[in-house]
């Protein structure tokens, strides 16, 4: 009897989606603050709608930051250079409403900058998850990796002129048929590919479909996963000329599943972009990913999830949890012991060990195409820590 398979789907959006535009602006502000003042405390939100971008939040920094310039530069880099494509970076309204971090939070978390790194408390309560799986070289879910890479490829062929009819906004979605092999996920085939991309007035739907298959899908999805039964929905609505902030309002923190694992594992609900590393929504999720990835890379399990939790002002996590979905070579309690011995989950130490005070153009790179599974030296949480265990007893 054939093994039973199931379908699972992940989606992504590319950098011209209004929510992702906002994530990128928020992280561009964070980068600018950290570049001048590594101790900046940043909680920067962004929203956008037709002809308007607003940044607001709480920022305490010694940096001199031109918020309006950051907004316009970020929108321009994405490709929003005229009203026709959804936003004109040089002529849109830019609103700024930034205040300082609450002194109540400041004294509880970092003692107004007097606490040593190991004493720095979590910036808030919350739960964070890290996930890893052996189904791809990146130790990430294949559905998520393919959906994300399709979005990145859409942007690449737009910017290099291969598909000149493309505009910045776009969404992707990939459904894969999986086999559950004792708790491990084994991709069998790609069942459905969905791409909805903004386009100009001149291109036909047939041209869109042909170009997407040739220049986007073919370079991204390995041929071994495609067959004559694979379903393609390419701009199924029939028309997507109006896009970006002109088509939909955008807001920071609305694409948290796209930022992480595409619906696999779990999510604690906290977003990443626009937050400095004292915000454990970000730093906690990063160290949890490093722990989960290290478990898989060290051969301790084929798939796993790590959860950590915090209280505001308290350095040590309240709890650490590991589940290997039955794929562990040793019991989960022993994997958990190794994790606790090898990873320091205190926010101040996460910041040092993952070098999270470095700005520049570091965090804006995370704000589109996922925070995990990226091959980039700035993604320090993707570096595997070898976890040694007694293979003889496994």
From Swiss-Prot:
Pathway: Amino-acid biosynthesis; S-adenosyl-L-methionine biosynthesis; S-adenosyl-L-methionine from L-methionine: step 1/1. Its EC number is 2.5.1.6. One of its GO terms (cellular component) is cytoplasm. K(+) binds at residue 45. This is S-adenosylmethionine synthase 1. SUPFAM superfamilies: S-adenosylmethionine synthetase. ATP binds at residues 17, 169-171, 237-240, 248, 254-255, 271, 275, 279. It is found in: Cytoplasm. GO terms for molecular function: ATP binding; metal ion binding; methionine adenosyltransferase activity. Homotetramer. Its cofactor is Mn(2+); Mg(2+); Co(2+); K(+). It comes from Hordeum vulgare (Barley). Binds 2 divalent ions per subunit. The metal ions interact primarily with the substrate. Can utilize magnesium, manganese or cobalt (in vitro). Binds 1 potassium ion per subunit. The potassium ion interacts primarily with the substrate. Mg(2+) binds at residue 11. Belongs to the AdoMet synthase family. InterPro entries: ADOMET_SYNTHASE_CS, S-AdoMet_synt_C, S-AdoMet_synt_central, S-AdoMet_synt_N, S-AdoMet_synthetase, S-AdoMet_synthetase_sfam. Keywords: ATP-binding, Cobalt, Cytoplasm, Magnesium, Metal-binding, Nucleotide-binding, One-carbon metabolism, Potassium, Transferase. Signal peptide: none annotated. It is an enzyme of class 2 (transferase). Catalyzes the formation of S-adenosylmethionine from methionine and ATP. The reaction comprises two steps that are both catalyzed by the same enzyme: formation of S-adenosylmethionine (AdoMet) and triphosphate, and subsequent hydrolysis of the triphosphate. GO terms for biological process: one-carbon metabolic process; S-adenosylmethionine biosynthetic process. It catalyses: L-methionine + ATP + H2O = S-adenosyl-L-methionine + phosphate + diphosphate.
């Amino acid at each position: 009897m054939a093994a039973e398979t199931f379908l699972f789907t992940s989606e992504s959006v590319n950098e011209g989606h209004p929510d992702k535009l906002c994530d990128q602006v928020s992280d561009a502000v964070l980068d600018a603050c950290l570049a001048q003042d590594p101790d900046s405390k940043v909680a920067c939100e962004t929203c956008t709608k037709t002809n308007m971008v607003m940044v607001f939040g709480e920022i305490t920094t010694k940096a001199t930051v031109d918020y309006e310039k950051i907004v316009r530069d970020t929108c321009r880099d994405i490709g929003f250079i005229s009203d026709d494509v959804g936003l004109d970076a040089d002529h849109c309204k830019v609103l700024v409403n930034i205040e300082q971090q609450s002194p109540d939070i400041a004294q509880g978390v970092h003692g107004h900058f007097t606490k040593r790194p190991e004493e720095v408390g979590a910036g808030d309560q919350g739960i964070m998850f890290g996930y890893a799986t052996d189904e791809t070289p990146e130790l990430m879910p294949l559905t998520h990796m393919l959906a994300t890479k399709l979005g990145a490829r859409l942007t690449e062929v737009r910017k290099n002129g291969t598909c000149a009819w493309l505009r910045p906004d776009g969404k992707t979605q990939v459904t894969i048929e999986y086999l559950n092999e004792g708790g491990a996920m084994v991709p069998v085939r790609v069942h459905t590919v969905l791409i909805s991309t903004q386009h100009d007035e001149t291109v036909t739907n047939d041209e869109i479909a042909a170009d997407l298959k040739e220049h986007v899908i073919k370079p991204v999805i390995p041929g071994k996963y495609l067959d004559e039964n694979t379903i393609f929905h390419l701009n199924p609505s029939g028309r997507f000329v109006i896009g970006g902030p002109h088509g939909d309002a955008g807001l920071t923190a609305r694409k948290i599943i796209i930022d992480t694992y595409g619906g696999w594992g779990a999510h604690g609900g906290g977003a990443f972009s626009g937050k400095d590393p004292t915000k454990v929504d970000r730093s906690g999720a990063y160290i949890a990913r490093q722990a989960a990835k290290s478990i898989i890379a060290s051969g301790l399990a084929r798939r796993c999830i790590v959860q950590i939790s915090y209280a505001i002002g308290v350095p040590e996590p309240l709890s650490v949890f590991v589940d290997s979905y039955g794929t562990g070579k040793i019991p989960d309690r022993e994997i958990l012991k190794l994790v606790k011995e090898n990873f320091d989950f205190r926010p101040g130490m996460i910041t040092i060990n993952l070098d999270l005070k470095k700005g520049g153009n570091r965090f804006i790179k995370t704000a589109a195409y996922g925070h995990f599974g990226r091959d980039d030296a700035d993604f320090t949480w993707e570096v595997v820590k070898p976890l040694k265990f007694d293979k003889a007893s496994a």
